[in-house]
């Protein structure tokens, strides 16, 4: 067993104080907003489709989907304890403790969602992961995969804060690997600034001004920056299977 496998086997025990939150209501609100502001515009055509979440954790995303009327929901995760919580949260009996590679080989979906999982997969398995996602989608199906953004100002933290992180992506490299199989590929910022309150609108405005100032400073230094998404902590690829 590799060091990564040992940590993943005891992931919640070893990293629980870093990744868990006691405020379940706040955590659910975060996923409700993430879905509403970042995902919904891409997935609204799949409300009647068969949907899989890879790495469904404690069911926050699935619960958010239920709140918007999505019903044909499936989830997989390696943590049995998290799945137990997810089942209680969502009432779904379609959640399984299963490896993504195994599940994708034998099932078909219209929409596949995956947040903060791909970076944990070994680099020499990354292409296989994308290929299995492609093969598992029905014609017209879509995959949305979210990962940490290596162009972010604090990207070193995202890359190395977790020993089990195997690879990091920028918007260019994320598009590269998905275009090996998908013809329709776009990469978007997965911003965590949700404009749903006066306070957050003010923060968003201040953030916009700060980003412009940083870009200007980098131009003065001769470093460009017009093509670097340094202000976004995460990015998401939206890939559609047209044929």
Report residues per predicted region.
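S-adenosyl-L-methionine-dependent methyltransferase catalytic module, highlighting the catalytic core
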Residues: 2-34, 78, 122-136, 142-242
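Conserved N-terminal segment of class I S-adenosyl-L-methionine
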Residues: 1-107, 111-115, 124-130, 189-192, ...
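Short acidic capping loops at alpha-helix termini that bridge into adjacent secondary structure
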Residues: 72, 140-141
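Short loop/turn segments at strand-loop or loop-helix junctions that form parts
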Residues: 115-117, 147-148
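Active-site micro-motifs of SAM-dependent methyltransferase domains
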Residues: 102, 119, 152
């Amino acid at each position: 067993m590799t060091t990564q496998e040992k940590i993943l086997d005891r992931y919640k025990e070893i990293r629980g104080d870093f990744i868990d939150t006691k405020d379940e209501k706040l955590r659910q609100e975060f996923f409700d907003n993430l879905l509403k502001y970042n995902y919904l515009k891409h997935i609204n055509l799949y409300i009647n489709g068969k949907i899989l979440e890879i790495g469904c954790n404690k069911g926050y995303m699935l619960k958010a989907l239920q709140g918007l009327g999505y019903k044909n929901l499936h989830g997989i995760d390696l943590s049995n304890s998290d799945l137990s919580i997810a089942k209680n949260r969502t009432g779904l009996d379609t959640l399984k403790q299963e490896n993504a590679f195994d599940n994708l080989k034998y099932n078909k979906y219209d929409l596949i969602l995956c947040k903060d999982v791909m970076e944990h997969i070994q680099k020499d398995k990354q292409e296989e992961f994308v290929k299995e996602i492609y093969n598992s989608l029905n014609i017209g199906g879509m995959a949305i995969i979210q990962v940490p953004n290596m162009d972010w100002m604090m990207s070193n933290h995202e890359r190395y804060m977790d020993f089990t992180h195997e690879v990091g992506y920028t918007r260019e490299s994320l598009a590269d690997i998905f275009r090996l199989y998908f013809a329709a590929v776009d990469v978007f910022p997965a911003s965590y600034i949700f404009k749903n309150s006066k306070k957050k609108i003010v923060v968003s405005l201040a953030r916009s001004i700060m980003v412009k100032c940083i870009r200007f400073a980098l131009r003065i230094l001769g470093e460009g920056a017009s093509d670097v998404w340094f202000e976004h902590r995460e990015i998401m690829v939206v890939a559609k299977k047209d044929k």
